[in-house]
Amino acid sequence: MSTIYQAKSIRTMDPHQPHATHIAIKDRHILAVGTADDIADWQSAWGPLEVNTDFAERTLMPGFIEGHAHMMEGLLWDYHYVGYYDREGPDGTIWPGLKSIDDVVAHLKQIQDTRDDPSEPLIAWGFDPIYFQGRRMSAADLDLVSAECPVAVLHASLHILNANNFIMDAADVKNADNSEFIRRDDSGQPTGEFLGQLGMYMAMRTTNLDLLAAASSPKTLQTFSQVARQTGVTTCTDLANPVPEGAEVAMRETVEKDSFPMRLVVAFQGNSLPPEESVARMQALQDKQSDKLRFSLVKFVADGSIQGFSARLKWPHYYNGAPNGLWYIEPDRLREYLTAFTQAGFQCHVHTNGDECTEVTLDAIEDALRAHPWPDHRHTLQHCQMASRAHFKRMKTLGVGVNLFSNHLYYWGDEHRAITMGPERAGRLDDAGGCLEEGVPLAIHSDAPVTALAPLFTAWCAVNRLSSKGVALGGESEKISVEQALYAITMGAAYSLKMDTEIGSLEVGKRADITILADDPIVVGAMGLKDISVIGTMVDGNVHLNQGRDA
């Protein structure tokens, strides 16, 4: 059916026609955009078009695009949230933040004491010790929860986990060769913290739980899409998935349904196999794609987490004197992978948190492009939180884009000022203003489940640059406008995914992916962005309303 939707305001993100009040949809695409005065012409050209006024008092925008999230957001709600900040679950339940390690232990102990099978692994997530005045969780803390079953607590960054002695013994930590992935105390004894991807794998394999495999299940996908719909996201990424054989088929069976309310862009985890095999696997995935499911990106994680002290920082390194972080992929190996995938014609996204990692990754990209020139590669640095103006200038020259982790400004801004970076470097944390001024394509993200999936909140962070304590990080030159932030969560993200000819703006011929808002973000302004209610979404013109939020 062909339908014209009337709205109070339509913000198109199309510079040719930035504002409208009516949009016509036919065959899953946008047929026309304009005002009430255009309806007669549309009817004459296209035949009868029903006028729907359900959203006549609402604002329509291009469907929000989350350019850096993980399907783990849909899985972790099966486990136990123990983060510092309150968090809304997929069903709307607000889970209160826990303000001390003792509170976390007491909460998990209560769960353990009421479980049907207390021998099963107990998994929690969202924890971050950086908020607790120097105290870190130990294996002995988690032994208070239980010493008779595996207890693992994933940090919010998903780069570190804490474990009890049950897991420590099962992992044979005392005889482990790769000691750099195990945190030790001043006496050299393991504390119960496992660092990085390899360290976390050492711990989790003892639980017989494969979270990466479970993250691709139909149930996880449905939960993931539910969170996306609630926050206005119509296209979301899973930005690092090894995509084992058969996983792509299971994903497609779920995602292709009209009732599934989002598009999914899966980034293949490029270093999950040796370079030649990895390229071959990526090539094999190309004919498994569809309009709603893409395997178009390759992802590499080059360093760790700043607040977890596993990111690679340039001199003077960490403000509190902590040792520099980890290379998740050694620089020479990263160069080898990037060269192989550039030669094969695949866009690469690279996680670079620390500024040393950003610099090394730009070196590797430059070498790859010298060997295999590619005018529109759109390789993208993800997070890239400590990039300087010099880095942005170099990105512009190389044609590299960036997707900044703007939510860090709120959730960890105070800690970066006081502990990890110091005031000067924290002042240019996630410098969206500098990025745009230097001409680098910009997107911004949540990295869900690291922080909550909520593009309007992410936009609010980039515009206002306020920490959770209300401290402003940087000055006006690091901020962006409301309009620029809205562009970053629509067309900016679409560009970073090479999907800007299909989605990201409301213009003729593009997919009918729309976010329905209670209020107009431009009218509401900078401080009110995060509080705008999402009524629902459309994907391919199919309407998906949020319960309890009347159209």
Residue ranges and their predicted role:
Residues T339-H349, E356-H379, H383-C384, R389-K393, ...:
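His/Asp/Glu-enriched, well-ordered alpha-helical/loop segment
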Residues N546-A551:
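Glycine- and charge-enriched low-complexity intrinsically disordered segments
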Residues K292-S310, V400-Y410:
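Non-cysteine beta-strand/loop elements that form the S-adenosyl-L-methionine
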Residues P18, G74-W77, S259, F295, ...:
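Short, solvent-exposed loop/turn segments at the edges of secondary structure
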Residues H68, G399, D513:
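Active-site-proximal glycine-rich helix-loop-beta segment
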Residues T254-D258, Q283-S290, H372-W374, M395-G399:
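Acidic (Asp/Glu)-rich catalytic clusters
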Residues S2-A7, R11, P15-V279, F300, ...:
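Divalent metal-binding segments
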